[in-house]
Amino acid sequence: MDYWDDWYASKAATPTVGEIMNRHLGLPPGLLAGVVPAEAIPELTTGLRLEPGDTLLDLACGRAGYGLTVAQGSGAGLVGIDVSAEALAQAREQAVRLGVTDARFHVGDLTASGLPDGSADAVLCTDAIQFPDDPSAAYREIRRVLKPGGRVALTSWEPVDRDDERLSVRLRRVDLAAGLAEAGFMRIEVRERPAWLERERAIWEEAVTIDPGDDPALISFHGEGVRSLEHLALIRRVLAVATAP
């Protein structure tokens, strides 16, 4: 996946972006993560109900900052799956830095992880469920790899109005409760987290003040800030947890 490999490589070459994001999100300096804030990590960990020795699948893990943190805090082993080999290379380096020894990373995607049926005790997927062309296939894949009674925790954005054409089609179709229910999950909870969105707002407000020059990562960060500020009022920030049958 050349686009994602290039994207992650540019972020690694320009640590300024991560420094700004982590400062607003309350994440530790140097943690390679996304836009889920620090206060979400205990909630994700609790929702996944991991025990020492369990297997946590971090699906579409990117550089696996969240999966590694949850695994480290719970004593679980981690399997990270992503389409980007570059992201996984950075994830492996991060696992070493964090001292997480039971962590494996493989190329795969949300709809075809390559893992055996029932091989995970829990699945974490942060801010990626919107990417597949067939979202229902992603929910089915999560159910397939989970053991009976296994837990899933998802974070994403949902539209305030699904008919609002100012939002991308990918975002307009995100419906965590419906997707999980269609795949057969039970005890589904979707929780709105507006405070997370305000942290994102602070990131993007700083991003648009930056002169990116010719730095690819800063150009991307600045542009994402402009687009995101236009749409923040149109979306809600959500976390979902559910149990496999």
Where are the model-predicted features located?
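N-terminal, positively charged/glycine-rich alpha-helical extensions of SAM-dependent methyltransferases
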Residues: 1-24
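Conserved alpha-helix/loop element of class I SAM-dependent methyltransferases that forms part
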Residues: 34-52
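Class I SAM-dependent methyltransferase SAM/SAH-binding core
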Residues: 57-59, 63-112
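A short SAM/SAH-binding and catalytic strip from SAM-dependent methyltransferases
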Residues: 122-134
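A short glycine-rich, Lys/Arg-flanked "PGG" loop and its adjoining helix->strand segment in the class I
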Residues: 136-148
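Conserved beta-strand signature within the Rossmann-like core of class I S-adenosyl-L-methionine
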Residues: 150-156
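Conserved Class I S-adenosyl-L-methionine
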Residues: 189-245
